Each structure stands twice: as C-alpha cells, then as structure tokens.
Amino acid sequence: MMAAGPRTSLLLAFALLCLPWTQVVGAFPAMSLSGLFANAVLRAQHLHQLAADTFKEFERTYIPGGQRYSIQNTQVAFCFSETIPAPTGKNEAQQKSDLELLRISLLLIQSWLGPLQFLSRVFTNSLVFGTSDRVYEKLKDLEEGILALMRELEDGTPRAGQILKQTYDKFDTNMRSDDALLKNYGLLSCFRKDLHKTETYLRVMKCRRFGEASCAF
C-alpha cells in the first residue's frame, strides 16, 4: 500500500492541476516559488502529452504510413515558431536566463490561443479529440501560470516582451480535403513541438533553481 505521505502529495498535486491559477493563488496566497514552478511543470507536461496523443491519433487515422516521413520533411511541417530565438533542447535552454525562458514560453503559448480556441469544432469524431474543447482553457491556464512566475521574478512589474506578429493559422474544418488534412497534420505537429519546448524550458528552470533529483530528463 502506498505510504500516506506520498499518496497525500500525489492527491494534492492532482487537485492543484485541476484548479485554474486564480483559484490556486487565492487558496494559497503564500505559495512558494517552487510551488508555482511545480504547478507550471505539471500543467505543461499534461498539455504536451495531450498534444502528442492527439497528433499520433490524427496520424494513425488520416495519414497513410508511407506518406508520414515525406510529409514531415516538407514545408507543411515547418513551424513558424522556429524563426524566433528559442532554444531547441535542454542544453541550449540552460544558456538562457529564467526570465528569457519564461518570455519565450509565453510567446509559444500565446501563438496557439487563436487556433485552438475553436479546435473542438474541427474534430468532432470519437478520437482523442473528445478532450479538444478543454485544450484552449488548459492553454490559457498555463499562460496565467507563466505570467504569475514572471511577476514573481520581476518583483510584480513584468516588462513588455517580444510580440509575435504572426500566429498559426486556424485548423481547417473540411476534413475531406487532402489539403486540409495536410494543413491540420502540420499544425498538430507544430503544436506538439512547441509544447515540448515549453515543458523543457519549465523543467530546466525548476531543476536549476531547486536542484531536485528528478532533473535528469
């Protein structure tokens, strides 16, 4: 049987994951910086896993196996977020300050708010897209968490950061069109990549600040 201590911690973590940031801050006004980072990492992990599962299910359902590799090496799979100075892995992320990583994470998150707002209208079948109506809310929630961390690190006065002049296109609702399928496939691929970057940056910051044993990832 699981010990009472770890089980209680696990239940608390799950409960916090289900709460919006406004409720978390209200319920725990004295939440430590480590607590804010822990919650941000949990939320980013959850969104990244959801993005990965959605991409895999879309690929399995709509994209023939023989076409996947060739498509991933075309312009369809190009993510415009690659044009911003964002680290591509853990080692590069460690060269950036925490505030730089938070600002980049915020840019990545905000670039998806428009396209994902109506995601559930596109994927209405019985795939994993059944949870797509909550993706936008989860993404907004992570945005609030990142802003909360920036306020903590900037003494409550966050500076204006870089604004992306371009965001991703909306998902195409015409799922019977090959062009629409390719477009949506590319968007889901980029969403997965950008959420992986965001999760990596948050984990690097958390591990760098608090030196936990779980830093090996």
From Swiss-Prot:
GO biological process assignments: animal organ development; growth hormone receptor signaling pathway; insulin secretion; positive regulation of biosynthetic process; positive regulation of growth; positive regulation of receptor signaling pathway via JAK-STAT; response to nutrient levels
GO cellular component, one term: extracellular space
Cellular compartments annotated: Secreted
Pfam families found in the cross-reference section: Hormone_1 (PF00103)
Taxonomy, superkingdom: Eukaryota
Signal peptide: 1-26
Binding-site residues for Zn(2+), renumbered to this chain: 46, 199
Keywords, sorted A to Z: Disulfide bond, Hormone, Metal-binding, Phosphoprotein, Secreted, Signal, Zinc
Modified residues (Phosphoserine): 132
Family stated for the protein in its record: Belongs to the somatotropin/prolactin family.
Protein name, as recorded: Somatotropin
Organism: Bos mutus grunniens
Taxonomy of the source species: Eukaryota, Metazoa, Chordata, Craniata, Vertebrata
